[in-house]
Amino acid sequence: AAGIMGVLVGIAALRLRGDYLAIVTMAFAEIIRVCFCNFSITGGGKTMSGILKLSTFPRVFWIMVVCVTIMYLFVRSKYGRTVQAIREDYIAASASGINVTYYKVMTFAISAFFAGIGGGIYAHYMTAMIPTNFNFNYSAELLSEVIIGGTGSLTGSIIGAAFLSALPELMREFSTYRMLAYSV
């Protein structure tokens, strides 16, 4: 389901790059959250509870290892190099005969697929999902993790996520200044 949503967002945001693409993606996430909070078919803003706790540390660790390995192999593959070429120079890649539209949409789908795996793990870890928890600030925090680690680097994104996840614990004594650290 996440991959299908990635295709839809990818098609909608096809002509955008950089900051504008991030803004549209975050806006789409906010629209989905508001829909989940307000439509009766999704249960409104109620908590979806009763999810089995299947996220044990060893299971999550091995899922993470498999996902990171697949992403690493993807980045090193011909497909991954093509996506990197599009990222570096959109016009040159297009002039070289690369179907930029196809690669951008499929990359969105693949990214959304892995995000969906993360969401599934999170749901099983929390055993309940509250739509209001996935607000704009949470999206901005996730985007910050990627930016701090480096947008073109898989290892950097992992380090950025680990750093910003550990930062609240490291800065517990200075909790009133937490947002100041994020602004830097």
Regions found by a protein language model. Name each.
Residues 1-184:
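Transmembrane alpha-helices and adjacent helix-loop boundaries
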